[in-house]
Amino acid sequence: MGDFGNVLTAMITPFKADGSVDYGVAAELAVHLANNGTDTLVMCGTTGESPTLSWDEEYQLFVEVLQSVAGKAKVIAGCGSNSTKEAIAATQKASKIGVHGSLQVVPYYNKPPQAGLEAHFQAIAQACPDLPLLLYNVPGRTGQNLQPETVARLAEVSNIVGIKESTGSIDQASEIRRLTPKEFHIYSGDDYMTLPLLAIGAKGVVSVASHLVGNQLQQMIQAFSAGKIEVARDIHLQLFPLFKALFLTSNPIPVKKALKLQGWEVGSTRPPLCEADLEVSQKLEGVLKELSLI
């Protein structure tokens, strides 16, 4: 259950000039990504600006993207919430649409203890037993770290199939890998950590950079899997400046700027996010030119 491949793109949400969701551009971008290294599209997560999307907008995005990439890529729906009841309702509705899985973020702001976090994910899994769930641990945004021991207990649930691990900690990822069966997939939640996490048994990455270099990320992962460590390392080091540039300010501000520099009409970010300032824009443009991406 729930093989999502190696490169999962945390896809941006395009907006029109009036701030409404541009479903047409979303569908076009999804096809482009599916044709350029992306195995699975992760919709309406952090990079997709889920905090400023309504549930109705999210469901419509799921529908449009599912139709556009049918047979080319899988779709994971971001349905997480800091309300267990709300997360269950959203996940059940997304499941009926036909998504291939759901991303479930650690509940934010209310900071449940580990027992509460475990019960939260257990409840969602039990309410949607046929839908693969991917845990999402990003304590820098949620204020709470999902401990490896908690992850290990959740990994025993048949439809909790993996984790997007975004602590940036080799220690944490190593302990998760040590405590969970190899069938439980660890995905790096940070592009710069992908190669290091592959070394301790990760499956791949939920990537922002794959909007721009999806094929190269596939090549890096496949090279590592084939034992061509130097090739994988060289790709990692070549792309490392891009990995850092895409987080010069709050994600997804830089990646949207990069896509616009490539000619994609993805619009701005919704407030309270804002446009990239001149310094960020110039640094990002320099990296993109250095890598011949614009």
Curated annotation (Swiss-Prot):
- Gene Ontology MF: a single term: 4-hydroxy-tetrahydrodipicolinate synthase activity
Q: Which reaction does it catalyse?
A: L-aspartate 4-semialdehyde + pyruvate = (2S,4S)-4-hydroxy-2,3,4,5-tetrahydrodipicolinate + H2O + H(+)
Q: Is Cell membrane among this UniProt entry's keywords? A: no
Q: Which organism is it from?
A: Nostoc punctiforme (strain ATCC 29133 / PCC 73102)
The active-site annotation reads: Y136, K164
Q: How does it assemble?
A: Homotetramer; dimer of dimers.
* Record has Cytoplasm as a keyword: yes
Q: Where is this site: Part of a proton relay during catalysis?
A: T46, Y109
- What InterPro entries does this protein map onto? Aldolase_TIM, DapA, DapA-like, Schiff_base-form_aldolases_AS
Q: What is its EC number?
A: 4.3.3.7
Biological process (GO), any one: lysine biosynthetic process via diaminopimelate
- Pathway(s) of this molecule: Amino-acid biosynthesis; L-lysine biosynthesis via DAP pathway; (S)-tetrahydrodipicolinate from L-aspartate: step 3/4
Q: Mind telling me which PROSITE patterns this protein's record contains?
A: DHDPS_2
Q: Which gene encodes it?
A: dapA
Q: Where in the cell is it found?
A: Cytoplasm
The task this protein performs is described as: Catalyzes the condensation of (S)-aspartate-beta-semialdehyde [(S)-ASA] and pyruvate to 4-hydroxy-tetrahydrodipicolinate (HTPA).
Top-level lineage group: Bacteria
Top class in the EC scheme: lyase
Protein's recorded name: 4-hydroxy-tetrahydrodipicolinate synthase
An annotated GO cellular component: cytosol
UniProt keyword terms in alphabetical order: Amino-acid biosynthesis, Cytoplasm, Diaminopimelate biosynthesis, Lyase, Lysine biosynthesis, Schiff base
The family line of this record is: Belongs to the DapA family.
Q: Where is the signal peptide?
A: none
**Residues bound to pyruvate:** T47, V206
